C-alpha cells in the first residue's frame, strides 16, 4: 500500500517574502488538501525513513549500481532496435527505433514486458528501467532478460 505525503521546503528568503507580503494573520502556506497533516501519512513516512537508514538502502543501491548499469549496457548494446542506452545510479533508459509511427513500438514493448512479469515505463519509444533499490543481482538479471526477450524481436 501507499500513503500520500507531501512537503513544502523553501529558503528563509522566500519564506520571509511570503510572510511579509501575505495577509495579516493569514496562513503562510495554506494547502487544505485531504491528506495535509494526515497522521498515518506522517507515521508511514517516518517508518520508511527509519528503514532506509537502518538498512542503509542508499548505500546498497550505490553498491549495486555498477552491476545494474553494466547489465543494461551489455544486454542492449547489440540489439538493432535499440538506438540509445543511458543510465545513472539505479535508473537507465533505452530508446527504441521508431517504426513508422512514434510511440507504437514503445507501447507494444510496455504491454509485452508487463505480460512477461516486468513493468518498464515507456514514454514514446523511450523505456525507463528502474529496479527496486533493494534489488539483488539475480533480480536485475531476470528483469533485464525479460525486457531483452521482448526488445530483440523488433
Residue ranges, per PLM feature:
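Conserved N-terminal phosphate-binding loop of PLP-dependent enzymes in the Aspartate aminotransferase
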Residues: 1-154
